[in-house]
Amino acid sequence: MIKKVFILALLMLNSMLCWGENSAERTKRNFLQLGLTMYEAEDIRILPTAEIKFRDLFEAVEKAEKYILLDYFKFQQDSICGVLIERLKRKVQEGVEVRIIFDSFGNHDSDFPLSDTLQARIRESGIEIVAFDPVRFPWINHLMHRNHHKIAIIDGKTVYTGGMNVADYYLHGKPKVGKWRDMQIRMSGPIVQAYEELFWKMWGKTAPSPLPLWGSASKPQHSYEEEKALPQRVSVEGAVASRWPGESPGIMRQTYVICIDNAEHLVQIVNPYAMLFGEVRAALRRALQRGVRVQFMVSTKSDGKVNDDVIGLEMRKLMKRGAEVYYFEDGFHHSKIMMIDSLFCTVGTTNLDARSLCFDYEVNAFIFSPATTHQLQQIFYNDMEKSSTLLTPEVWQERFPPRRRIRGRIYSIAKRFL
């Protein structure tokens, strides 16, 4: 009897503690239950444009002392890539080790793919560069699981990640869509370890050369006495979710659903390929049913007509259920961000389509920081007020005539493979 009362008391206490949690605290607890690790993240900076991102990255490259690790879906053979490669060559001459991974399919799909000749010259300079999983006929099954990462790591101390590849169109746009909007996040501290471990895992899968013997972010960068002498940095908690086919195939769907299900007041999402289906769509509907305010931003113009028509149908469904849908007009918004209750956010590589959620290698940082979240919200509100159109039934009727609706319904049949 006493044992039963004790167990009942523990259950009641646990319920009371959970009742007092906010959405961020519940999400962290759910992430730990999911098997994710919570890391300290320091010196977080949102890089809201390509100009700021590449300038910041180039400065970090110049300061590198040991190694530079780059893992990108696309390395386009153009001017910004040329500038980066020349800087990397100089660092190799200074004794810094440089390794690059790029996706083979992403390269072939590029406007200006890296040529074999340029790759050979890069290797001759001392930079190790490898293509992830080359697509060779007839093994077309390799098309399904692509390396969609966008990661740069400097000395195991700093990581850059987000939606940007290495390509000129992030700076100058494309004729079809105009400006190409995107953003990155830069972080320091123990959270870099998660990205470096992911890089070496990908390198081991891709490259024949051995892993390095030198230290990584998993080891202290300074002694205890040196740490005491360093300026104190503000740190927050963060988690890193990495989709790896065959090992963690559902992790992106699970983390997004957890965040949305825990939202109490506000869900804000910017995503370029929001061909919603399954668990994520159901989570958004549940949030709306709970009275949570949902604000979703997509682009009027994107780099695919198929995407636009399917996304239009999904956005109409959300609008009819009470969501605020904003169409970004000033180019193509390629960012992949989400903010929950002004308390925490995610920045990463994941699109809300089948490729990212069910097939590709992806990685997202979940940052439990109101300050960082507010920075993203300010960008969101600025875009909403100055560069967006609120979707209404009248706007939808005007933008989606019958031919687009029919086309969208036909394409929706195959959206689990788009």
Feature locations, PLM:
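Sec-dependent N-terminal signal peptides
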Residues: V5-L13
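Charged, low-complexity intrinsically disordered terminal segments
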Residues: S15-L418
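Intrinsic disorder/low-complexity segments enriched in polar/small residues
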Residues: K4-V5, N22
